[in-house]
Amino acid sequence: PGFGFSVAVMTIVARSLGQGKPDRAERFTKITAGLAFVAMSLMGGIFFLFAESLTRLFIAEPQVVYWGSLCVMVAAFEQPTLALAYVFAGALRGAGDTRWPMYVTILGVWIFRMPLVYICVHVWQFGIVSVWVVTALDFLLRSLILWRRFAGGGWK
């Protein structure tokens, strides 16, 4: 759903700005962010509550189900921030500010996530769950940066 909200807000922002209505673009972005946050928080709740059942849909080996369930539980917590990162990136893209979402994605994946995952797994030996924790932190970081860029209003 996050990607769908991103595409929807991108279209609404582009159309609103094309009509000379930046306040409308801002209002609909905030509404879309709220809807996406709620929808993906609910999905996260489902992930968390049914982590083991969801994991068992793909594999039955007990140890893999155990570790997979833990990863799904962590993924549950990244859903709200993933929603916000997608929505604010979409809003900025719709406004023609395409570089910031690209820069933030590069920063998040290649400067933050990959090195930290490497350190967590190979240096600190935290294991597979740490990969998911770092990914959740990456989306939190991205959502905060993109929200700040959007809130700054320079895209108007």
Where are these regions (language model features)?
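Transmembrane helix-loop junctions in multipass membrane proteins, especially transporters and channels
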Residues: 8, 52-61, 91, 95-98, ...
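Internal alpha-helical transmembrane segments of multi-pass membrane proteins, especially GPCRs
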Residues: 27-38, 69-77, 103, 107, ...
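Hydrophobic, well-ordered secondary-structure elements that form the walls
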Residues: 18, 25, 54, 68, ...
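Alpha-helical transmembrane segments and their lipid-water interface positions
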Residues: 2-6, 18, 43, 117-120, ...
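Membrane-interface helix-loop junctions in multi-pass transport and translocation proteins
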Residues: 51, 57, 65-66, 109-143, ...
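Alpha-helical transmembrane segments of multi-pass membrane proteins
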Residues: 1-2, 62-88, 107
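Hydrophobic alpha-helical segments typical of transmembrane helices
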Residues: 9, 67, 76, 88, ...
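Small-residue-rich hydrophobic transmembrane alpha-helices
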Residues: 1-51, 82-104
